[in-house]
Amino acid sequence: YFTNTLVTYLPSLDETSRRRRAERPEKPQAATVDNYYLVKVDVKEANNVAGIFLPGLELAEGTKLSFLFNPQSDIFSLTCTSDYIERGNFFVSDLNVSSRNQGDSISLYLRSDDIFVGGVYMPDFSVQGGVKENQIRLATRFNNKENGAYALISTVSTLQSDPLSGIPQLRIHFYPSTFGTDKQIWALGAKEILYDSTRMVVDSFMMVSGKQRLVIDGVASHSMADTLHLRMDNFDLTPLSQITDRQGYRISGFTSGSADMAAALGRGVLYANIAFDDIRVNDIPMRNTVFRSKWDFNAQRALFELADRQQQTPIVQGYYQPSERYYR
């Protein structure tokens, strides 16, 4: 039932979806009226049980899930509420999710007071979207009143299959999107991002504010033949504080330069030359510096150096051995 329902709206999930749906017997319309099923889950003390299915998963007491569906007419409605859900570095509080299908599309609404994922804190978080004809449209926003950071990111993603390998792919395009603080606003977007299980192709992802510019372009994969390029022009590091604030570090300043990484999803061969200006960490001024990195093919490791820009003297030197995940 779930597979057939999904491929109705995302047929590229299964090349045989049309054939399989055609084989389903037709039911008289009257038979679909009362063929509803209801699944309800009300969590009491389930953390020990939840950990069996997903180690480390914690659910708040009172978490509720309700799923109403009719397998004959392919109609469903889902709601979920929870005071919190936590696992590892993922945390969400006051979660409210609702989704339903109607006609030829699925609608989705999600709201949370706080979401913390991958080191990024996003309060007052919401997602609105829909799924129709292999396309997923999402509008995602958050608003951090503590530090003034906010974002509105709108995308349309098309699910498809690679014509040669048959691997499912997601082709992402951006509507006008922004990231801002109480002092300035960055426009962000890309010509296109193509993602599958083997690689990610980025076509000119940019964050721009006036003369500031950050551009990511290229291919991230496990292959040394693919390289991801980063270029920054007088780019304000304020957006980085959205990640570092929760670790107790407020970072400001500007950076310019470039970096290239081959096999970005594999061992990661990095070449970089990036200058840092007017850097402050927790309001403490730092020296203007430059970070350089190159690959030592003989030793199969990355050499890096952080040097004083004015004196051209090294502050930190070392290397990274990808095969051992070791810094020195």
Can you name each region flagged by the protein language model?
Residues 1-258, 265-328:
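Interface amphipathic segments
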